[in-house]
């Protein structure tokens, strides 16, 4: 084999990248060159003497051998390189297998976590279902208890009529008014139409011949409720919703006290000729004033309460009638008030309720705001004392003899307290089934001895409970607009007047042929309970969730009235919007939400 062939093959191998240029290879080549030069010459001579065929064959073999050599070198080098890369490949393979194992472990962990999550969700769902089923079962049990037979009535109509005929009973009407049989036969007699807004207040005079009503339309109407005719109608002088209008006792029906959303307390002087002489402001709260409290026998003095937490005592005999009696506080914070009532058995004492869960009783002779903020004693259902949901009292009222105190809580139930119990005492009765959320809902006793509890509801129904058994004995559809707010019993007869979002007053008498069957009561109670539970999950503050509803309701009604008015007026009549009679409406537009019925400021 010639050296030149090796060199040429060496070039080829260098080009192909298979030639070894390490120092060991180079030194071996030089040593071979020095020791065998003769052999190479001899070999070259021999190669020159060969024939052309042999030369071609030899060249071919030489090429083959060189190619084999280069192939061996290439294989040797490639083996060296392969050995280097094979370690990396093994490492990469190990890394890959390790990462695959980790991925498998992660997938297994994720699957296990997903399984655990599904199990937790199933347990939670099962717990929720169990809780809802328990609540449903408890509600069904309560409804079943509501349908259990009531004890026999103490008053029976036939025997009472027979005794009256014989002259042996002088208390027939008194006992009949408190009879369950009459309450279960309540039926709508008629409506009194005369307002153009929601009716927020009702009050019978002492004799029961007249009924006063006040409305969002800022008017007060005095009705002959039997003949369905207004005896007197006048502007109240208030700038916003009239919340209460009451005849002062022993005044000959000549004095009517009023309060409203504008915070004013006003007095109207009525004449015997069925006209209003004038109205004057006697007190001014810094917030809305929802309720007045009359003293049973006084034609000159009464109390007012406002959302500014102030209670005024008003004496019409004074040049400056109003004087501040107390500011209601819990620790150092003022508590806005929605309701106030004087104890009929002890007129020095009065109770208030408002923007917290406590019924507070004060004694006008013992108010010292430095001692317990002047409070004589407080009542609250014990489960509401530490409740996260913010409870509010929308209305409270004393019983006929002052021994009991009834309080209605916002989005809660109605509770009865014994007013003679000590400070912090628990309630003695609880009345359930209605819904008190959308407005400042009223509550009242019915019957000459406060035998029943009556309340409106957001579902538009009127509920009457028997006080002693807490069972619902009457259930009536009382308002098409959806909310019943006011309930006023007649002072002497089995008559009930109610009002709400509708623009009329409804008169109820026991004229039904058969006692009520309470049809649909179960479904209504379940719906009220479900809505109350849903609202309690995102409860914020009193009526925040319902303010928008009432604003939209009011704006829709205002738009409908405006469209009807515009449709009936010509172009010339349209200019009458600037007349003095429309100045109140412009003020109302500025007030905006102030014309929303029965919503706190």
Swiss-Prot record:
Protein family: Belongs to the WD repeat DCAF8 family.
UniProt subcellular location: Nucleus; Cytoplasm
Ranges of compositional bias, category Basic and acidic residues: 61-99, 127-140
Annotated region described as Disordered, given as residue ranges: 1-150, 561-601
Record-given protein name: DDB1- and CUL4-associated factor 8
Record keywords: Coiled coil, Cytoplasm, Nucleus, Repeat, WD repeat
Biased composition (Polar residues): 1-24, 46-60
Gene: dcaf8
Organism: Xenopus laevis (African clawed frog)
């Amino acid at each position: 084999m010639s050296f030149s062939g090796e060199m040429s093959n060496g070039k080829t191998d260098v080009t192909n990248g298979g030639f070894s240029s390490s120092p060991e290879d180079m030194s071996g080549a030089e040593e071979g060159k020095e020791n065998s030069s003769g052999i190479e010459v001899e070999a070259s001579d021999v190669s020159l003497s060969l024939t052309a065929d042999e030369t071609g064959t030899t060249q071919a073999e030489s090429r083959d051998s060189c190619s084999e050599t280069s192939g061996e070198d290439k294989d040797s080098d490639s083996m060296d390189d392969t050995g280097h890369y094979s370690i990396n490949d093994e490492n990469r393979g190990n890394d890959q297998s390790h990462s695959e194992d980790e991925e498998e472990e992660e997938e297994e962990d994720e699957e296990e976590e997903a399984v655990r999550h599904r199990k937790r969700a199933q347990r939670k769902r099962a717990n929720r279902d169990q809780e809802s089923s328990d609540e449903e079962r408890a509600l069904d049990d309560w409804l079943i208890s509501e349908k259990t037979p009531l004890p026999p009535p103490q008053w029976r109509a036939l025997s009472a009529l027979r005794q009256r005929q014989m002259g042996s009973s002088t208390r027939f009407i008194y006992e009949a008014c408190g009879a369950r049989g009459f309450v279960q036969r309540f039926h709508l007699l008629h409506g009194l139409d005369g307002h153009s807004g929601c009716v927020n207040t009702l009050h019978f005079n002492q004799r029961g011949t007249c009924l006063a009503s006040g409305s969002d339309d800022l008017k007060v109407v005095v009705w002959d409720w039997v003949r369905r005719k207004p005896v007197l109608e006048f502007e109240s002088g208030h700038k916003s919703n009239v919340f209460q209008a009451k005849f002062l006792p022993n005044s000959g029906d000549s004095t009517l006290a009023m309060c409203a959303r504008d915070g004013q307390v006003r007095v109207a002087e009525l004449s015997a000729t069925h006209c209003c002489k004038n109205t004057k402001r006697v007190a001014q709260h810094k917030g809305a004033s929802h309720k007045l409290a009359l003293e049973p026998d006084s034609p000159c003095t009464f109390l007012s309460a406002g959302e500014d937490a102030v209670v005024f005592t008003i004496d019409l005999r004074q040049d400056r009638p109003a004087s501040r009696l107390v500011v209601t506080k819990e620790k150092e914070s003022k508590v806005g008030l929605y309701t106030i009532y004087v104890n009929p058995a002890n007129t020095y004492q009065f109770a208030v309720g408002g923007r917290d869960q406590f019924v507070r009783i004060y004694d006008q002779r013992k108010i010292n705001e430095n001692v317990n903020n002047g409070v004589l004693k407080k009542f609250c259902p014990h489960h509401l004392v530490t409740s996260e949901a913010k409870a509010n009292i929308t209305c409270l009222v004393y019983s006929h003899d002052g021994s009991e105190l009834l309080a209605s809580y916002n989005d809660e139930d109605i509770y009865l307290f014994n007013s003679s119990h000590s400070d912090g005492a628990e309630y003695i009765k609880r009345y359930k089934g209605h819904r008190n959320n959308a407005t400042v809902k009223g509550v009242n006793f019915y019957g000459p001895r406060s035998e029943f509890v009556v309340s409106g509801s957001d579902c538009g129904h009127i509920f009457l409970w028997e006080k002693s058994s807490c069972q619902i004995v009457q259930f009536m559809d009382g308002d098409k607009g959806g909310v019943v707010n006011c309930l006023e019993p007649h002072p002497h007869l089995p008559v009930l007047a109610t009002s709400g979002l509708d623009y009329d007053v409804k008169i109820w008498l026991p004229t039904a042929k058969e006692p009520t069957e309470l049809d649909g009561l179960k479904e209504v109670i379940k719906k009220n309970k479900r809505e109350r539970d849903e609202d309690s999950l995102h409860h914020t503050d009193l009526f925040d969730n319902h303010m928008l509803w009432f604003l939209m309701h009011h704006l829709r009604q205002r738009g409908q009235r405006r469209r009807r008015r515009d449709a009936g007026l010509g172009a010339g009549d349209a200019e009458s919007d600037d007349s003095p009679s429309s100045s109140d409406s412009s003020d109302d537009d500025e007030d905006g939400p102030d014309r929303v019925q029965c919503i706190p400021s």
